[in-house]
């Protein structure tokens, strides 16, 4: 009986060791930043059944990085990375930026799908304005070699920007129907938060948390 107990104890300890090893491996894997352009087909989030990959997220990552970098250069033009590492409101600026990029993508996906159901499209004037915005954004992105670092092509960025423009247009329509200001339905707006609760989304943390915001299109 003693031998049986000893054998069972050995088995239990072995199983626990395996579990601990798997946990340690997964934890280490979660802490490792990914090389963005090597993971473009990885799913970052699912919104109402629609999967958005890192390729789909590229525009939002670049947009947020460039916006925050402007603030970083004002804070310390000689060492902008210092700003990205500031800890404020309980988290680092780079973490806040990563969350903002994801929130914008989810927001646009929701409003874009709503727009499609209502057959909302851009007018010729809106398409022309979008075309100019796309060219400006691509120029700025290329200026920092961002597209190469992201691993995306012009069509990927333009597609996301068109989707965002349509989403924004429907956001304005939706806000008007609700007698609200368009900003109430921005991704941080109070009324949008209530709308968000009616939608299903799941962020793939094992992928998204490994995106090193501040160092994807930028070199710090």
Where are these regions (language model features)?
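Short, low-structural-confidence N-terminal segments
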Residues: 1-93, 190-220
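Alpha-helical transmembrane segments
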Residues: 20-23, 104, 119-120
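A generic secondary-structure micro-motif detector
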Residues: 35, 100-101, 133
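Active-site SXXK
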Residues: 103-116
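Charged, solvent-exposed helices and adjacent loops that form client-binding or oligomerization surfaces
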Residues: 66-97, 116-190
């Amino acid at each position: 009986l003693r031998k049986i107990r000893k054998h069972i104890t050995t088995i239990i300890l072995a199983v626990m060791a395996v579990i601990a090893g798997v946990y340690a491996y997964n934890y280490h894997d979660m802490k490792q930043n990914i090389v963005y352009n090597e993971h473009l087909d990885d799913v970052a989030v699912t919104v109402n059944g629609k999967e958005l990959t890192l390729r789909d997220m590229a525009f939002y990552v670049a947009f947020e990085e460039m916006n925050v970098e402007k603030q970083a250069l004002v804070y310390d033009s000689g060492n902008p990375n210092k700003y990205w590492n500031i800890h404020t409101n309980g988290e680092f600026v780079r973490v806040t930026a990563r969350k903002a990029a994801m929130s914008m993508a989810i927001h646009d996906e929701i409003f874009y799908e709503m727009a499609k159901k209502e057959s909302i499209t851009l007018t010729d004037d809106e398409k022309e304005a979008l075309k100019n915005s796309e060219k400006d954004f691509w120029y700025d992105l290329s200026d920092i070699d961002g597209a190469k670092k992201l691993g995306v092509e012009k069509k990927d960025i333009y597609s996301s920007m068109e989707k965002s423009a349509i989403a924004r247009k429907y956001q304005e329509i939706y806000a008007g129907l609700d007698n609200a200001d368009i900003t109430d339905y921005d991704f941080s707006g109070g009324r949008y938060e209530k709308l968000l609760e009616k939608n299903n989304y799941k962020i793939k943390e094992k992928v998204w948390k490994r995106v090193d915001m501040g160092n994807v299109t930028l070199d710090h």
